[in-house]
């Protein structure tokens, strides 16, 4: 499954997703102004248009080794990040927001 996000500036969003969040571009359509990206098992697509960020609904989730460390790194990079949540001692989650307010979630399975 691939989650689609609308972004105001495709070029700026491509930089954010590749350089800040570590995605790799798998496809770019300059004419239609969209790109497909992946990071491990997580696949997203970003397309130029008016963003429609949602608080609920589908969200791309990226598995990371250490949610707290990633949150600190992103916060230092002035990326909007939420509070780290721990679910039943089994998982840590944190919401990250791209420059257009689209929500991405980082997840860490706990031992």
What is the predicted function of each stretch?
Residues 11-24:
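Amphipathic alpha-helical segments
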Residues 1, 32-33, 58, 70, ...:
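Residue-level marker for the onset of beta-strands and adjacent loop->beta junctions
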